[in-house]
Amino acid sequence: MELTPREKDKLLLFTAGLVAERRRARGLKLNYPEAIALISCEIMEGARDGRTVAELMSYGRTILTAEDVMEGVPEMITDIQVECTFPDGTKLVSIHDPIV
């Protein structure tokens, strides 16, 4: 199977998101990379499901709370930007202060 660098990046991010999802389900607090991966995956999947950029920007702030992550992680993540493929093209979804 031949993958472009972009496809490899998406696959790696999705894999990290699955690991984060499983750890969260076991009750573990997520670290910085896991939190980024989980939020990014949820946003990419939302785009695939047909949600709008505005909906995803709002939804991105509800995925994780400070209780879901290790101490200090919310302060480290001020912005997340995810490039998503929508039916009308590729767009950048920005989530400001995603963990409250």
Swiss-Prot record:
UniProt enzyme class = hydrolase
Reaction equation(s) it catalyzes: urea + 2 H2O + H(+) = hydrogencarbonate + 2 NH4(+)
The alphabetical list of record keywords is: Cytoplasm, Hydrolase
Q: Where in the cell is it found?
A: Cytoplasm
Q: Which pathway does it serve? A: Nitrogen metabolism; urea degradation; CO(2) and NH(3) from urea (urease route): step 1/1
Q: What is its EC number?
A: 3.5.1.5
Q: What's the main place this protein lives?
A: cytoplasm
User: Matching SUPFAM superfamilies, A to Z?
Assistant: Urease, gamma-subunit (SSF54111)
Q: Which cysteines are joined by disulfide bonds?
A: none
Q: Which residues form the signal peptide?
A: none
Q: What induces it?
A: By urea.
- Which Gene Ontology cellular component terms are annotated? cytoplasm
Its family? Belongs to the urease gamma subunit family.
Could you give the subunit structure recorded for this chain? Heterotrimer of UreA (gamma), UreB (beta) and UreC (alpha) subunits. Three heterotrimers associate to form the active enzyme.
Name of the protein described by the UniProt record: Urease subunit gamma
| Taxonomic classification | Bacteria, Pseudomonadati, Pseudomonadota, Gammaproteobacteria, Vibrionales
Q: What is the name of the gene encoding this protein? A: ureA
